[in-house]
Amino acid sequence: MIKVAKAVVLITCLGAILAVTVPASASQAMHRNRTIRIGSCQISGRFATCEASGSVNNPIRIKVHVKAVPNQRFSGNWSMVCSKRNGAASSSGTVSGLTPRVKELRMPFASPDSCDVAAIASLNGRGSLHVYLTARVP
């Protein structure tokens, strides 16, 4: 009877350890990707304009962030050139709206080896403008 009770306690403890360990290791595998800032600019004034640019290796996704104080309308555009193996391709587009604004940029192909990115934005009035680029990487 005592051996059965010890076995039940041992199995219960082992189950509790596995219940904590397995989700933790699965969680670590899911969170290996991280977001990094690859370019930034800040400026103040009437119709303030600034350009953020940068390079990134193995991006999963790239975003442009536009913030202003006070919040207001803005317009801008972005472009990128990415390489993969022996080839290269580009993509570009516009970004506009009301700050704060975050826009995911369309990469020219999936899983590029590297990308060079630039984004420019201009305020429609007076204020402080902050434009920055982020990338999700492995």
Q: Which residues fall in each region the model found?
A:
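Secretory targeting and sorting signals
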Residues: 1-27
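Post-signal peptide N-terminal regions of Sec-secreted extracellular proteins
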Residues: 27-138
